[in-house]
Amino acid sequence: MKKLLVLSLSVMLFSLTVLAQGKPKNVVLLIGDGMGLAQIYAGMVANGNKLQLERCKNVGFVKTYSASHFTTDSGAGGTALACGVKTKNGMIGMNADSMAVYSILELAEKNSLATGIVSACAVTHATPASFIAHVNNRNMYEEIATDYLKTDIDVFVGGGRKYFEERADNRNLIDELKAKNYQVAYTIDDVKAIKSGKLAGLLYEDQNPAMPERGKMLPDATMAAIEILDNNKKGFFLMVEGSQIDWASHDNDAAQVVKEVLDFDETVGRVLDYAQKHGNTLVIITADHETGGLTFPTGNIKAGTFEAAFTTKGHTGIPVPVFAFGPGADKFTGFMENMSIKAKIERLLRL
């Protein structure tokens, strides 16, 4: 009996090792904006000392400095993850010399993979914009919205509807999306009802509400996107952003940090369930930077409580963790530059 148990464990460990070292068909990149190790631990302690993230056995650390600053912003941080280059703070989808650079999403699209973006904020905000747009100022929201029309992205879901229809140039990008055969959804129920084709989910006029008012928007929209993207037999690339971990950290609101981290972690768990079932999907979870300089002088694990101490209302320059699960996960261990993540995905997807 002992021999059988040892053999079974050996086979299981071997299978996990082979899985981690293989080549994925699909990649889901989940970005917890502003999510450092402390934010993760806050969610863990408050959640009975456990998170879905712990299912990822391949863990590393990402250096987040930009081309212009020790402490990055979400424009440069998102661009490094999306486009594989260090750029100046405030820039989107461009290198430090203001030259446009293809994102991993655009490369996937050019190689006939399905592509998608799901965000807990406006789809024109810095992190999602880094995967789709090329502008020298992250606040060029109308120009960023226009860039969605310049691609063939299959699915995008988030807020920011006003940048598509209440514009200075009087263009109605929602009509233009419909002309390109996008199904435009305005509620999460409408998003969940769409099973194929192209989807533009513009659920909020401006920014998405915070948790708990947002409900299950992020995990539900993520799985709805995966269901659509999975129709492509060649595979897909999906970026998912837990945007408001950052905002809660800017506010130094530890209780809200926990709510946003747990919403993001539920999304991670659902994606990991999909990846575990199908075996051909690489899941990467990381952050563009840490926000707030959060620390815990004391706490109580059994009670699920902690004393939170923030050192800033801005970003910090400390490295952030990266977690990976599935084929190719072994490539995301140790210390790495944020810009290297795009190159790793590109090689694994053979783009």
Model-derived segments and their meaning:
Residues 1-22:
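Bacterial Sec-dependent N-terminal signal peptides
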Residues 21-160, 164-167, 173-191, 197, ...:
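N-terminal catalytic scaffold of extracellular/periplasmic and nuclease hydrolases
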Residues 29, 201-203, 237-241, 284:
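Structural motif
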Residues 37, 262-301:
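Metal-dependent active-site segment of extracytoplasmic phospho-/sulfohydrolases and closely related
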Residues 84-88, 198-211, 246-251, 323-327:
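Gly-rich Lys/Arg/Thr-decorated short loops/hinges at beta-loop-alpha junctions or inter-strand turns
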Residues 95, 185-222:
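Functional beta-strand-loop-alpha-helix junction segments that form "active/interaction loops"
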Residues 126-131, 205-210, 214, 222-226, ...:
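Active-site His/acidic residue clusters
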Residues 256-272, 303-316:
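Gly/Ser/Thr-rich active-site loops/lids in small-molecule metabolic enzymes
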